Amino acid sequence: MTHFLSSRVRAIRFAIEGWLYVIRTQQNAWIHTLASICVIAMGFWLQLSKQDWAILILTIAMVWIVEFINTSVEVLTDLASPQRNSLAKVTKDVSAAAVLIAAAASVIIGVLILGPPLLEKIQALISTF
């Protein structure tokens, strides 16, 4: 049992190191971090339903997962092809496109979920003046 727990702790530590690597080396990771924090804070403020929370959490996770995979693809491509190579460029471009699609989808989902209750709150605030 002790070996099982220590190996789980080690695995979690490696995962955190990977996440920190992405945050340190990828400029877009800072955008994802800020967006994640803002969406979560807004979700609490708007008192979202469990269903809306589930969708937002899955959406945030999707963007992070694709960013992690993109970073892995970039690092492996650099390792395999340190010189400029047209196929290496295609590999990186396609991987970056996946992040772009995930991020764009997350914005649309965020607007669909957060938009109506946010407008309601804003209208309520305006009507008090």
What is the meaning of each model-derived region?
Residues 2-17, 21-65, 69, 99-129:
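Hydrophobic alpha-helical transmembrane segments
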Residues 62-98:
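Acidic (Asp/Glu-rich) catalytic motifs at the cytosolic membrane interface
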